Design a protein with these regions (language model features):
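Conserved alpha/beta-hydrolase "acid-adjacent" motif
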Residues: 359-368
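C-terminal catalytic histidine-bearing segment of alpha/beta-hydrolase fold enzymes
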Residues: 367-370, 375-422
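N-terminal membrane-anchoring alpha-helices
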Residues: 2-94, 404, 422
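Short beta-strand/loop motif that positions the catalytic acidic residue
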Residues: 345-347, 352-354, 358
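Membrane-embedded segments
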Residues: 110-156, 160-253
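Hydrolase active-site cap/lid region
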Residues: 278-342, 348, 398-402
Length: 422
């Protein structure tokens, strides 16, 4: 009996051991299968992210343009660009400059805002139907108020045509023909200088940080003309290229100079600095009169180094094939924005502004462009100025316009070269 019990127990123990061995074997096989599947998925993800996507980028001109210009990123949402007053800009005209792009054989509509200078708005506030609360806030920064007031037109006889338009009994400021006549007369009649603003990628001329700069410049008594290149805002729905956006800027520049003889300055921000330097080089090649000077805010030296430093490329910049699949294809498709080349091709004075805590266009690239300009530009050409904004101020990529010393820098720079021809 005892022997039978022992045999039964031994059999049960043997069965349990066998079951345990089978379970452990199954666990090992399952673990191997999971590890193998995980490795396969990891390799597949690696291949897709680090090989397939760069190769798609290399061979897709459309994708290259999309990533560079970022026209699909729009903010603020539901912004009506036809009504600049909804963005906080009174006495501002929305217009469209249409020109023929001969190379692409298409008509291009470039959407534009023309923001009137403060002194003009204050002078004709009643006629322009601006409320008292708004007018009371339209003052220049205190540090430059005296200098800015000197820029204002004091000769009342200059305003004869303006007054005739504004004092019509049937005046309708919402009428497009009336707006055109009125705003173009302000360019002709006044002596206020004009700033043509060239924005960077993403959004439109209505982005809040851009509007903030317009308000600052108008408070310094400058006309501000801001445009959206093709593909941006409510401009022509055409895929942008470097050549295309430069010619859009040229069309608006020629629109301004066809009306006014007053000094014009270019102000480029981020990608717009590449547009500005290329435009100045183009004007020189075409032997056309250029602007008095140019401001480059958050500039870079060329698109090859900028895309390598941009946050978007963080995953890819250390790949051995980064240049082969990303940089070189863009250059082959004429997406270069070579400010380090163009800055040696025009004579106008240059003011560079860059924040140390700029994480989109690193400070080092702006300073590198400055050093290149010092080495390559003619000794008799317009000077180069570089202003560094400390990282402790937290201006980043977009908000140098909030620097308390910026109005003094801008007014002094523009006044210095206002009557100079290079």
């Amino acid at each position: 009996m005892r022997r039978a019990v022992i045999i039964v127990k031994a059999t049960s123990l043997s069965s349990a051991v066998g079951t345990l061995r089978m379970y452990l074997s199954f666990r090992r096989r399952l673990f191997k299968r999971i590890c193998l599947t995980t490795c396969k998925i990891s390799i597949l993800v690696f291949v897709i992210i680090f090989i397939v996507l760069p190769l798609i980028f290399k061979f897709s001109f459309a994708l290259q343009k999309s990533i560079l210009f970022l026209t699909f990123i729009t903010y603020p949402p539901n912004l009506d660009l036809k009504k600049p007053e909804k963005s906080g800009l009174c006495a501002t005209r929305n217009l469209y400059v249409t020109y023929r792009d001969q190379e692409e054989d298409i008509d291009v509509d470039v959407a534009v805002w023309h923001v009137l200078p403060n002194d003009l708005v204050r002078r004709f506030g009643k006629e322009l139907q601006i409320d008292e609360a708004t007018l009371s806030n339209m003052t220049a920064p205190e540090d430059v108020r005296d200098k800015v007031d000197k820029l204002a037109e004091n000769d009342s006889s200059k305003y004869g045509n303006l007054e005739r338009i504004l004092h019509r009994s049937n005046l309708n400021l919402a009428d497009e023909a009336t707006q055109k006549e009125l705003f173009e007369e302000t360019l002709r009649a006044t002596t206020n200088d004009i700033v043509l603003y060239l924005h960077g990628n993403t959004a439109s001329r209505g982005a809040s940080h851009r509007v903030e700069l317009y308000k600052l410049l108008r408070s310094l008594n400058y006309h501000v003309v801001a445009l959206d290149y093709r593909g941006y805002g409510d401009s022509a729905d055409i895929s942008p290229t470097e050549r295309g956006v430069v010619y859009d800027a040229l069309a608006v520049y020629q629109y301004i100079t066809s009306i006014s003889k007053n000094p014009v300055y270019l102000w480029g921000h981020s990608l717009g600095t590449g547009v500005a330097t290329h435009l100045l080089s183009l004007l020189t090649d075409m032997s056309l009169p250029g602007p008095r000077a140019v401001v480059l805010e958050s500039p870079f030296n060329n698109i090859r180094e900028e895309i390598c430093a941009h946050p978007f490329s963080k995953l890819y910049r250390h790949l051995p094939w980064f240049d082969y699949t990303i940089s070189r294809p863009m250059y082959a498709n004429e997406l270069r924005f070579e400010s380090d080349q163009h800055i040696a091709e025009f004579r106008q004075p240059v003011l560079m502004l860059h924040a140390e805590d700029d994480h989109v266009v690193p400070f080092s690239l702006g300073y590198k462009l400055y050093r290149t300009a010092l080495d390559t530009r003619g000794k008799s050409w317009g000077p180069i100025e570089f202003h560094r904004f400390e990282k402790t101020s937290h201006y980043g990529h977009r908000y140098i316009c909030r620097a308390p010393n910026l109005p003094e820098i801008v007014v002094r720079f523009f006044r210095t070269y206002r009557d100079e021809q290079y």
